[in-house]
């Protein structure tokens, strides 16, 4: 059985890969603000692992910083939030239609190492809890297995209109 079709006892796809064409159906973000290129693992209602490929073609590198390009830390956090939004949509299924995931708060944010062009961010998000339409997550971003950023954050799921 391939990883794409492996299921656990609850029917959750453990090895499900969500490519960019599906991501743009799931969340409203677009270039230049789409900060997740692929989701390589989703365990509905639990966790997800996303990828952000950092390239020199990102528009913010013109000013952050021209002599030493550094991926802005706030965009690492945004990558975590967008990966969490994919997890929310995957968890809610059809009931997510007509809903948006709004970023609410960030706590305990730490940036450990700079990220630059050529790096691949592995974004690990873990659902800590949900109460009603408010979900809380813990996120970690790694490059080559090394922790570069971490945070806890919350989101609210509301009707789109």
UniProtKB/Swiss-Prot annotation:
CDD domains (UniProt xref): FabZ
A GO biological process of this protein is:
lipid A biosynthetic process
- What enzyme class is recorded for this protein? lyase
Pfam families in the record: FabA
Q: Which domain of life is it from?
A: Bacteria
- The residues responsible for catalysis, as annotated, are 64
Q: Which InterPro entries match?
A: FabA_FabZ, FabZ, HotDog_dom_sf
Alphabetically, the GO molecular function entries are: (3R)-hydroxyacyl-[acyl-carrier-protein] dehydratase activity
GO CC aspect terms: cytoplasm; membrane
Q: What reaction is this protein's catalytic activity?
A: a (3R)-hydroxyacyl-[ACP] = a (2E)-enoyl-[ACP] + H2O
What broad class describes the main subcellular location of this protein?
cytoplasm
Record key words, sorted: Cytoplasm, Lipid A biosynthesis, Lipid biosynthesis, Lipid metabolism, Lyase
Asked if the keyword Lipid biosynthesis belongs to this entry, the reply reads yes
Its annotated compartments are:
Cytoplasm
Where does the secretion signal sit in this chain?
Answer: none
Q: Which HAMAP family match?
A: FabZ
Query: What's this chain's function?
Result: Involved in unsaturated fatty acids biosynthesis. Catalyzes the dehydration of short chain beta-hydroxyacyl-ACPs and long chain saturated and unsaturated beta-hydroxyacyl-ACPs.
By what name is this protein known?
A: 3-hydroxyacyl-[acyl-carrier-protein] dehydratase FabZ
Please tell me the species this chain comes from: Paramagnetospirillum magneticum (strain ATCC 700264 / AMB-1)
What lineage does UniProt assign to this protein's organism? Bacteria, Pseudomonadati, Pseudomonadota, Alphaproteobacteria, Rhodospirillales
Gene encoding the protein: fabZ
């Amino acid at each position: 059985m391939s990883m794409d079709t492996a299921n656990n006892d609850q029917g959750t796809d453990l090895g499900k890969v969500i490519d960019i064409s599906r991501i743009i159906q799931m969340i409203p973000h677009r270039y230049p603000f789409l900060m997740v290129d692929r989701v390589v693992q989703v365990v509905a209602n639990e966790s997800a692992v996303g990828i952000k490929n950092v390239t020199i073609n990102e528009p913010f590198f013109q000013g952050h910083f021209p002599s030493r390009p550094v991926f802005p830390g706030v965009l690492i956090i945004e990558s975590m939030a967008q990966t969490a939004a994919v997890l929310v949509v995957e968890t809610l299924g059809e009931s997510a239609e007509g809903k948006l995931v709004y970023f609410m708060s960030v706590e305990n944010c730490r940036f450990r190492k700079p990220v630059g062009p050529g790096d691949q961010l592995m974004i690990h998000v873990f659902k800590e809890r949900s109460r009603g339409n408010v979900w809380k997550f813990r996120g970690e971003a790694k490059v080559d297995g090394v922790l570069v950023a971490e945070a806890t954050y919350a989101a609210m799921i509301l009707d789109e209109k």
